[in-house]
Design a protein with these regions (language model features):
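N-terminal, Lys/Arg-enriched amphipathic/low-complexity engagement segments
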Residues: 1-25
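Short histidine-centered loop motifs in beta-beta connectors
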Residues: 22-31, 35
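Short hydrophobic beta/alpha edge segments that flank linear recognition/processing sites
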Residues: 33-46, 61, 72-78
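Conserved hydrophobic positions within beta-strands
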Residues: 55-57
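Acidic low-complexity segments
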Residues: 64-119, 129
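Gly-rich Lys/Arg/Thr-decorated short loops/hinges at beta-loop-alpha junctions or inter-strand turns
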Residues: 83-85, 113, 135-149
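Hydrophobic alpha-helical positions that pack around
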Residues: 174-286, 292-297
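Ferredoxin-type iron-sulfur electron-transfer modules in oxidoreductases and energy-metabolism complexes
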Residues: 326-341, 351, 355-431
Length: 431
């Protein structure tokens, strides 16, 4: 793993989580310290943003977001001093036994799910209190190319276990389960050597299969419970957090360090089929990250954020990495599987590989007809976009992409219906 120096400028979008966007707490011209809170929102589902370098705020303006669109961002000119902000002191031993103190620290440190979903961790744990009896830490890391979790386990085993212990205490539980695929035996052995039982943690070696790292698959593997269509993990008494989220909890509580960096993987044929694992500050533009890896061997045709199966397409190299960026993959024609006229040949492979036992070929058909009633009937909203159907489709149908689009359409329809209902209610009030 390589720690890369932060860039001359960091670009910090105010939206790095699911929920309410943050609002800037600083103005252009302000000097900020590394770790200083620079944006926040009091809404329950939100997480503050912190300066990842010290320096001067030179802009607060729309900038490219890694997930698309232009999003308000705070731009800081790095003074290369890393002058620390000391607002978050390490928790005392007494506070580390207090669930409320831990939850408040997780929230103030801006910690969100590092597995990609970016759900605010404090809200997730708090929402499970009284409902959840099982805390699972996801160490499967089943996506090809990605190695950040594996390296975190090897480099910080004891810190990880302490972070899991804190999450367990905050959840009001006596035990947590750390699910790790058996292809990471070196990390499993290292964690076992640290006596995880003293932290209330049980290491659970898991079979190596995709998509073992999906939240619902982790729950099934460890508890044999199944999340029903439309249900949530808390509905079966479970909460799942990622490896790097647990490490971020450790740093926030033991070091007083808010969430300002993570380990990510850079790889792909455009990088000469080399893989780089970098500890990188949030707000670092992709172009700078590529430079630190020696540049492209070939110009990429596709940029993927995350893994090749469940990752999202990015289009702008000036977009920065954010809290949920587990990897950046740069692909050329070598990996391009698209065809001009994809055709379903009714082979049924998509039915056999779907871990949720959905029927992708029918979901795809009903999407083509914009048949929302039947899309819902066939549980299209329960697809967690693992990509298994697309990968195995001999007709090269863009199944996973289609289902992602369908979810956006459902969300848009719901927003329209809500707006119409609110407008009708206002109209009724004026009569």
């Amino acid at each position: 793993m390589t720690v890369i120096a932060p860039p001359p400028q960091v670009v910090l979008p105010v939206m790095q989580h699911i929920g309410a966007p943050c609002k800037p707490l600083v103005e252009v011209g302000d000097y900020v310290k590394m770790g200083q809170k620079i944006a926040d929102n009091p809404a329950p589902v939100s997480a503050p943003i912190h300066a990842t370098v010290s320096g001067k705020v030179i802009a607060i303006e729309p900038r490219p977001h890694p997930l698309g669109d232009m999003v308000p961002a705070i731009v800081i000119e790095n003074d290369f001093q890393d002058t620390p902000c000391t607002d978050l002191a390490p928790l005392t031993p007494e506070q580390m036994k207090d669930p409320e103190a831990i939850l408040e620290r997780i929230r103030e440190a801006g910690i969100v799910g590092h597995g990609g979903a970016m759900f605010p961790t404090a809200f997730k744990i708090r929402g499970g209190l009284g409902k959840v009896d099982t805390l699972i830490i996801n160490g499967a890391e089943c996506e090809p190319y990605l190695n950040g979790d594996h390296l975190t386990m090897k480099n910080h085993p004891e810190e990880l276990l302490k972070g899991i212990e804190l999450a367990r205490i905050a959840s009001g539980l006596d035990k947590a389960y750390y699910g790790i695929e058996k292809n990471k035996q070196d990390a499993i052995d290292l964690l076992l050597s640290k006596n995880p039982a003293q932290y209330g943690v049980e290491i659970v070696p898991e079979n190596v299969k995709y998509p073992q790292g999906a939240e619902k698959m982790q729950i099934k593997a460890i508890t044999n419970r199944e999340v029903k269509p439309g249900g949530l993990p808390s509905g079966v008494g479970c909460n799942v957090i990622s490896t790097q989220t647990a490490y971020a909890i450790y740093r926030a509580c033991y070091e007083g360090m808010p969430s300002i960096e993570r380990v990510l993987t850079v790889a792909g044929s455009a990088m000469g089929d080399k893989s780089y694992n970098l500890q990188c500050r949030f707000g670092t533009p992709f172009s700078y990250i590529v430079e630190q890896c020696g540049g492209f061997v070939v110009e990429p045709k596709k940029i993927v954020l995350g893994g090749p199966m469940m990752g999202l397409i990015a289009t702008n190299l000036e977009a920065p990495n954010i809290k949920g960026t587990a990897g950046i993959l740069f692909f050329t024609d070598k990996e391009d599987r698209s065809v001009e006229n994809p055709t379903c040949i009714h082979c049924g492979k998509c039915l056999t590989v779907c871990p949720m036992k959905l029927e992708p070929l029918y979901m795809y058909k009903y999407f083509q007809n914009r048949d929302f009633e039947n899309m819902q009937k066939y549980h299209i909203l329960d697809c967690f976009e693992c990509g298994s159907c697309s990968y195995n489709c001999p007709g090269r149908l863009p199944l996973t992409h289609t289902f992602k689009t369908a979810k956006l359409l459902f969300a848009a329809r719901a927003a329209e219906e809500k707006a119409r209902a609110e407008a009708a209610a206002k109209e009724a009030e004026t009569k």
